[in-house]
Each structure stands twice: as structure tokens, then as C-alpha cells.
């Protein structure tokens, strides 16, 4: 559900007004509304744009062939015979096409050769033709971290970054947006020397208090009910939606949600002094400084979806309000 992200939406629409020059990395805590924002962004784009949207989490990716399958995963009744047919499909698709259309024979060739360069050359050629037809192409990859460790004659992610740099900084052919909820992956990207001066970073955080209250009240909750939901769930959109669904037993639902999350945090931290020490930093604080060093302890807490690292703003914080409360409850049980 999309609600009141006009500021973020306006910024995204402003980005595509200018010539492509930077890769835009969209990041934020889990379930903060990144994908909902990008879908609304696509809907609000002017008609002369076309977005190629690829969700890398659509199916498991364990090897290069899986990545190629998702990249070019478009199902049509009849196989695509040539570039002209692929181009026709893009032009007639409207403002969004899920995946990149490719002639069947060429797809087989790309899969047999195991050379990402050939796949990227084809995409460049297709985007060039799309632009010649008066459309402005936009490439969007959701859940980019899924391929972070994939290798094909070396790490695939570096070849992808080089390709994105070519599309934006060098050829000015297409805007490129990537989306991730993995803050460790985001920290790795932010520290990557090859991306310095070639990338921009766009934080999509949970709703602030005012927006969350307005959302809850717009869905029929009273001031008292809205404040109760906010106390437990902060501005995490999916949690707020669930709170609305459980309005009839809202207080009981909130308490049960916190109890469950507390058990998860307790189980994660039990018997681990270094984890407990890290979590103790949030006993009286909602966020702490991030020095730039990712310790094994911090990595574990982030992978467990308990903490979120924001390398751009230099902070570490719980993934959301519920996690903050659960950390504090678990600490009372552990110490």
C-alpha cells in the first residue's frame, strides 16, 4: 500500500528529468516501503519513459544461468525471433515491462557462452533502439544483494557495476535504479572505490511519527488506537497495516507481536556476551554512531534483521520500533 511518500516520489521524478549520469542506490530498513515507492514512481512517470523492472528475488539465484533467466524472463505465446520484435514489445508495453525481451536464439547463445559482456552488449543495443524510438529507458533492479556473491570468471557484481557506469556516466543512455534492504551489502557498495563519483544514494526509511499517525487515522483508527499502534510499531508500513486489520483486539495484538519479537531477540542473543554487549548500546538510545567498521558481531545482528546500518548517515539502529522494544525487553531477561 502506497501512502504519502510525495517528497521521495518528487525526488525520484526529478532525477529522471536530467540526463543519466549516476547509478541510484535505493536502500533502507526492511519493509520500509521501497518497492511500493518504486511501483508508484513507475505509475507517475511521464508516458515517454519505459521502465525495465527486474525483481532478482523472484526465483532463487545460485548460478549465472539463474541470473540470466531472471534478467530476460518474459513469457510470450510466441518466441521472439529478432531485435525488431523485442523492440516492438518494449514500445507497446506502456511504462513498465517486467524483464528484458530477447530473441530466443540469442538467449541460448548467451547462456552457452557464460560471458556477461554479451548479455550487457545486447541490453545496450536494445536500450539504444528504444531511445531512438522516442522512449527514455530506465533500468530497475530490485533486491540487488541477491547476486552479491555470484561469480563468473570473478565476482559478477563488479561486471554489473561497470555496465551500470557505462549506461549512466559514460553513455548517458539510461537511468539505473537498484533497490536493497541489506544494509551490509549497502555498506559494501558505499565503500566501493569504483563507484566513487558514479553513484547516488537514496534512503527510504520508515514513516515518521506524523505520517504514521495520519496513515492510521486515514484507515479509521481513533487517536488513541493510532497512538497505541505507533508506540509498538513506529512507522513500519506492514506492521501498521496488520495493526489496522487487528483493530478489534489491537492492544492484545500489539502485546503478542512484541512478545514474539522479544523471544526471537532473546534466542538470538542468549549465551553470546558480545551480542548482548552490542544490544546494550540501545538500552537508552535509539541509534548509535557507525564508525565504518563492520565487526562479526554487528554482521550477525544485521543478518538476523535486528539492526540496520546506515553507512551514509553513519548510524546503527534497530530495524524498527518493534525491534527496539524487543531488544530492551530481551536485555531485561538476559541481564
Curated annotation (Swiss-Prot):
Q: Where is the signal peptide?
A: none
MF terms per GO, please? ATP binding; ATP hydrolysis activity
Any idea which UniProt keywords this protein has?
ATP-binding, Nucleotide-binding
Q: Where does ATP bind?
A: 28-35
Alphabetized SMART domains for the sequence: AAA (SM00382)
Keyword match Membrane: no
One Pfam family, short name = ATPase_2
Similarity comment: Belongs to the archaeal ATPase family.
The entry's protein name is Uncharacterized ATP-binding protein PYRAB06260
Q: What is the lineage of its organism?
A: Archaea, Methanobacteriati, Methanobacteriota, Thermococci, Thermococcales
